[in-house]
Amino acid sequence: ERIGCSAGIPIIEELKARLESTGADAFELGIPFSDPSADGPVICISSKRALAGGSNTRKCMDVARQFRRHHPDVPLSLMIYINLAYAPGLDNFFEECREAGIDAVLIPDIPSTMRAAESEWDSAARNHDVQLISLVPPNAADEKIREISGHSEGYIYLMSRNGVTGTDRAACMPPSHIVNVMRVAGAPPALLGFGISKPEHVADAMRHGVAGVVVGSAYVRIINENLDDDEALHRKLSEFTQNMKAAAKGALLAE
C-alpha cells in the first residue's frame, strides 16, 4: 500500500514520524499547490493549510531528504503539479529530486501529448534516474494503454474513476481488460487510486489484478480529525493501514 500526504502542514515533523510508523509499503509526498485541479476537497484543504503554514517546494524537498536519511530503502514518490515542476527547469527539478532521494514523480496535470518515450520530460527524468509515473484513466482506449505502457517506468497510476481525488465518491474497479492490456504490453505494475478508502476497496482492487493501491484523502481525513490528539492520531493511522494491508493480503491468499 502506498500512502500520500501533503507536505508542509505546521505539524509536519511530528506527523511524518507518525506516518512512517504506520507500516505502509511506500510513501507519496504531495507538494501543496494553490490550484490542485486533480484533488478533491479534503486534500485541497490540506494544501491550503500547508501553504498558509509557509510550505513551498524547497521545504518539501527537505522533508523528502529527512525521510530518505531515516528510511534508505522505502520507496518514495513525489506528487507535484506541472507549473511547480517546470518553474526551476526540468533538468534542475529532476536533479534535485534525485539528490533528495525521490524515486518517482507523478504529475497529475501533465497533458498526455507531452508524454512520449522521447519527450523532454521523460528524458530529463531518465537522465537523473527518476521514474516519471504515467496515469491511465478508466476509459482509455486499448491503443492508448499500450502506448503508455510502452514508455512507463516504476508503476502506472490507474485511476479508478474520472474526476478528482477523495472519498466523497467511492472507487470504481478497473475492468480486468485494462489490466490485461497493460500486462501484455509489458507495463510496470498498476496501482489503483482515486476513492480508495475502505478495506473492501483494496480487496476488490487486488481481485481485479492490480498490484496495489494508492490511498491519500482517507489518510488526510484521519489527520484532520485528530490534530489535537496525538495518541489517537497514531492509533488510527496504524489501525487503518493494517486493516488495508490485511485486506490486500487476504485477497492475494484467496487467489
Describe each model-derived feature in a short phrase.
Residues 27-29, 76-80, 105-107, 132-136, ...:
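Hydrophobic faces of well-ordered beta-strands that scaffold small-molecule active sites
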Residues 34-45, 52-67, 84-92, 109-127, ...:
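Active-site-adjacent beta->alpha loops and helix N-cap segments on the catalytic face
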Residues 183-188, 197-255:
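Alpha/beta catalytic cores of nucleotide-metabolism and tRNA/nucleoside-modifying enzymes
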Residues 23-25, 97-104, 125-132, 150-157, ...:
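Glycine-enriched alpha-helix->loop->beta-strand junction motifs that scaffold or abut catalytic
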Residues 24-36, 104-114, 157-167, 208-228:
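Glycine-rich phosphate-binding active-site loops on the catalytic face of alpha/beta enzymes
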